[in-house]
Amino acid sequence: MQLEDMVAAIEASGQYRILRRLNTDCSQLRPRDLFIEPGLIGTKLGGLLDCETTGTDPRTSEIIELAIVPFSYDGDGNILAIHQPYHRLREPSHPIPEAITQLTGIDDAMVAGQVIDLDELEAFIRPIELCTAHKASFDRKFAEGLSPAFASIAWACSVTQVPWREEGFESRALGYLSLKSGFYFDGHRATDDGVATVEILGRRLPRSGRTALSFLLEAAAQVTARVRAPNTPYERKDLLKARGYRWSDGSDGSPKAWWIDVPENRLNEELAFLKAEIYHRECNIPIRMITARDRFSVRAD
């Protein structure tokens, strides 16, 4: 009995689920049965960016590994093909913390003398229409710190802009999403994480039947308003929390205030809520309109 026949027999029993290892060797990648056949009309180029860094603060930490996995897609959110990725290591100005080495497997010896050629990088990303990351609020800030060319690209986030919970997923972690999608991979290396994320975006979600990418494209196209509520009465914080506001303590350089992002068509409703339920008066409330060109960047903070 062939291996695939054995797998089919085990799965048919209804007692087991099989996890397949995802091939992340992009030199062997081609349009797979998972995706529809590539076409030319309406095809766009996206890029899945992932970086490994020396820490979590883009003001003090540095990129040590950068990967961008390009993929072709259509306007309906179907992924047509995955293309050869960009991948580079980079030596930081300080030794890599041991905790980062344990997490990623990247040590000082691996990155010694390694640099990222910005001309090469910027030429690679020039055709990309939408840059996606699994937690874009992290990756975009690091990417723009490396090259200002990333600021001119529209960005999307596969963590926050896909309705994972509504589709039956209990976590948005990449490892969990891959296991629920029926495969596993070697995580915490930039290219592997990138290929795995593209794989997940191309699959149809269990409840809606739509691809994850279709939700991502829809969310990225929206104009949203970031509404800030500074100097609110302490006793009304629970009202803000219940409505979905988050607290910024200013430690990341953003204003110290409660804030929420709402669709443009809900802005007036949100302002009315703040004036009636929080401030109990007419007031000027700070608002910033945000598109995919600025979303997840320091400019949106």
Model-predicted segments: where are they?
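Conserved beta-strand -> loop -> alpha-helix junction used to position metal-binding or nucleic-acid-contacting
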Residues: 151-164
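Short linear loop/turn motifs
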Residues: 114-119, 189-196, 250-261
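Acidic, Mg2+-coordinating catalytic module of metal-dependent nucleases/exonucleases
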Residues: 128-146, 164-231
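Acidic two-metal-ion nuclease catalytic site recognized across multiple nuclease folds
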Residues: 1-37, 203-301
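Conserved non-catalytic scaffold segment of RNase H-like nuclease domains
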Residues: 2-153, 171-187, 277, 281-284, ...
